[in-house]
Regions:
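The serine-hydrolase catalytic nucleophile loop
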Residues: 5-17, 31
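Alpha/beta-hydrolase active-site loop
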Residues: 11, 44-65
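Active-site glycine-rich loops that stabilize anionic/oxyanionic intermediates
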Residues: 2-7, 78
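Short beta-strand/loop motif that positions the catalytic acidic residue
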Residues: 197-198, 204-206
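Alpha/beta-hydrolase-fold enzymes
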Residues: 85-165
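Alpha/beta-hydrolase fold nucleophile elbow
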Residues: 65-78
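Active-site nucleophile elbow and catalytic-triad environment of alpha/beta-hydrolase enzymes
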Residues: 176-194, 208-210
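Conserved alpha/beta-hydrolase
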Residues: 18-38
């Protein structure tokens, strides 16, 4: 699975290619509402459906005649690490899980980068999101905020070294979403009950300069 607010060309395809070169059958995909996958509004944040995308991938792979259903695993990169964990908790067909530079999007939107987000700020953002739902409903048009590439996001300065340069930029993806849907992340807790995945193996890949 590709990073949040990315598309499959941004990291996921590379990982799939490397896995294929190692002899595995690999599938990369665009999350619902992103890239070439369907769904409106574009760029919507719906963690439960992001989780479902992993199980949908298992549906597809597990019905190919050349696939061993007992050897299907998932890889989640950055934000997709959390979605991959959540999928593995509830889908026993996933026999192994790996995450790379996993980022807990739920925790980020609850407490901010390095826990700098206050309850007051969070509640203010939830109120703004609620008001934007009325606006979108009455106008029939989604309300978009700044994209993940914009400086309003503290991590943008580092992530733009990839997403806004030749090696990582995809012209069709401005990484914008609807602030109203960000509220869905507040209720996303992928680490809860993670021990239920056992005895299936889990690999967390981390790095100091990821």
């Amino acid at each position: 699975g590709h990073p949040f607010a990315a598309v499959r060309q941004q990291a996921a395809n590379l990982y799939a290619t490397k896995m294929a070169e190692a002899g595995f059958v690999a599938l990369s995909f665009d999350q619902m509402f992103w890239g070439e996958s369907g769904g409106t509004p574009r760029g919507a944040v719906l963690p439960d459906l992001y989780v479902e995308s992993f199980s949908a991938g298992v549906d597809y792979l597990g019905t190919r005649p050349f696939i061993d259903r007992e050897k299907i695993g998932v890889i989640g990169i950055c934000g997709s690490g959390g979605f991959a964990i959540a999928a593995t908790k509830i889908d026993p067909r996933i026999k192994a899980l790996a995450t790379v530079s996993m980022y807990d999007m739920g925790e980020y939107f609850r407490t901010g980068l390095n826990r700098t987000r206050t309850a007051e700020t969070r509640n203010k953002d939830l109120q703004t999101a609620a008001e934007q739902r009325y606006t979108a409903f009455e106008s029939g048009t989604p309300v978009y905020g700044p994209g993940q590439n914009d400086a309003v996001f503290p991590e943008a300065a580092e992530s733009n070294d990839f997403y806004q340069t030749e090696r990582g930029k995809v012209a069709s993806n401005d990484r914008r979403t609807t602030p109203a849907s960000y509220a869905k992340f507040i209720n996303f807790y992928p680490f809860n009950d993670m021990d239920s995945i056992s005895p299936r193996p889990i690999l967390f890949v981390v790095g100091e300069v990821a």
